[in-house]
Amino acid sequence: MSVLNVLIYPDERLKTIAEPVTEFNDELQTFIDDMFETMYQEEGIGLAATQVDVHKRVITIDITGEKTEQLVLINPELLDGEGETGIEEGCLSLPGLRGFVPRKEKVTVKALNRQGEEFTLHADGLLAICIQHEIDHLNGIVFADYLSPLKRNRMKEKLVKLQKQISRHQA
């Protein structure tokens, strides 16, 4: 397995709308494994293929962070949502930053598993929030897009500064 490079906001590639997966082959299975490896390495609970510059509708989730409840959603569709909730969300593409995003408390999602079999999932709590967050990525949306322009610009400035610091340390 390989750790993939996570795109950092405001990288324009994060705005790309992902295409549906049509082939379920060994390459897809390896990519899913690499997504999980990357997600765990970065200490995340969810990752969308868009975040690693692959613009296919693939999401990996494990809200335990302990490799015990791996969930793969391919070509996910939100069918229903109810209730209102929200938390200070973080994101691997916005390292070290958090922002409040209003979300549905419960969601129903239809997706394909890694073998291409369709299933329906009813989720609530953190799992529901994570699913909505990752589907946003597939639609070219990051949580910063929900924030005021002032907060969004501050985040961009912090991340540009962080990227410059990282570049200097790597040189």
From Swiss-Prot:
GO terms for molecular function: metal ion binding; peptide deformylase activity. Its cofactor is Fe(2+). The keyword Ubl conjugation does not apply. This is Peptide deformylase. It is an enzyme of class 3 (hydrolase). InterPro entries: Peptide_deformylase (IPR023635), Peptide_deformylase_sf (IPR036821). Belongs to the polypeptide deformylase family. Coiled coil: none annotated. It catalyses: N-terminal N-formyl-L-methionyl-[peptide] + H2O = N-terminal L-methionyl-[peptide] + formate.
